[in-house]
Amino acid sequence: MRILADQAIPYVYKLFGSDNYVQVCDGRSISANMLKDVDVLIIRSITKVNHMLLYDSSIKFIGTVTSGVDHIDQNYLKNNNIRCVSTPGSNAVSVVEYVCATLFWLAQRDCFFLRDKTVGIIGVGNIGNLLYQRLNSLGVHTLLYDPYKSKCDTDRMSWKSLDILVSKSDILTLHVPLTYTGAYPTWHMINKDILDALPSNSILINTSRGAVVNNDDLLAILRCGKKINVILDVWESEPKLSLPLLSYVDIGTAHIAGYSFESRIRSIKKIYDDYCDYFNVKNKVNWISLGLSDIRYIAVSRLDECIINRLIQLVYNVYYDHIALKNNVLRLRGFDKLREYYCFRREWSSLLVDSKNGYNNDILFKFGFSTL
């Protein structure tokens, strides 16, 4: 079987190479003439899959190592009997830890405590729900907006309308797919009206899709002097992004929130598992063989938000990724290369923390660290 994969996806040869002919290439360069004799295509969100790409191909199976599938024409695949699998939830831990890392970084810089803030979470799927759980473990007040989930889960008291959530939140974080149609389209859902309604000195975080926020409206309101702290991991028109907007944001990164080592392994392992099921191939790979067993140990004598911030930075300092984007954005393929050659970043569970206190250990465990 012939397999073509994005060269930035790890472990493709290790997982698929023993019984197949595997090739890798730049995901943006994948074209129709490369797919004529290919059976399996493994991609990221930068590859647009539609009739123009597949019309003359022999593709039977497509795996995308992403939660969202807005880059794939699902109707075309269904009509042509092409199996498509994605990895919803595989990057949830990584994105949530990125969001928390940015919040703790801002808290240290601006001298505030998260427990004194209200966090509004827009989109309560795999990522939004996990963020809700993590913040709750620290006693942080949260409000939720998800018109689809709230219809099914009426027990939570945190559900709010979008207008109320925006007006009552000190921190607004977005975890929605990019949609253009339906009852609640998310394209440009954060526009001038929403930005005007944000309280002064609030924090806006987007790790979903760039076009969920109208970047022109955001730049205009920042230029007018409104005080909003902005965290952007995703941008309209990636890999091109607004350099003026980058100059205003507090943290700007190259769409790497979901790029922890563990999340990337989870994603490609799920694609491999689905591939094995679909083609009835024996699954030969386990987690340990992919190098996920390494762990570090640290003991702490007390637990507060300052200690938690130090623990987070032992694993991941988000400001380094901000500096990397600012230093490389003007270079040839700078944005793409930051993603393609992203550093070896672990999740918090790779740090074993012992606070010598069962209650504190329970908090640390619920927040994502390994504990005794």
From Swiss-Prot:
Active-site residues, Swiss-Prot/TrEMBL: 209, 238, 255
UniProt entry tagged with the keyword Oxidoreductase: yes
Subcellular location: Cytoplasm
EC number(s) stated in the UniProt entry for this protein: 1.1.1.290
Cellular component aspect of the GO annotation: cytosol
Swiss-Prot/TrEMBL GO biological process terms: pyridoxine biosynthetic process
GO MF annotation terms: 4-phosphoerythronate dehydrogenase activity; glyoxylate reductase (NADPH) activity; hydroxypyruvate reductase [NAD(P)H] activity; NAD binding; protein dimerization activity
Keywords in alphabetical order: Cytoplasm, NAD, Oxidoreductase, Pyridoxine biosynthesis
Signal peptide start and end residues: none
Catalysed reaction equations from the record: 4-phospho-D-erythronate + NAD(+) = (R)-3-hydroxy-2-oxo-4-phosphooxybutanoate + NADH + H(+)
Reported function: Catalyzes the oxidation of erythronate-4-phosphate to 3-hydroxy-2-oxo-4-phosphonooxybutanoate.
Assembly and binders: Homodimer.
Similarity comment: family membership: Belongs to the D-isomer specific 2-hydroxyacid dehydrogenase family. PdxB subfamily.
Protein name, as recorded: Erythronate-4-phosphate dehydrogenase
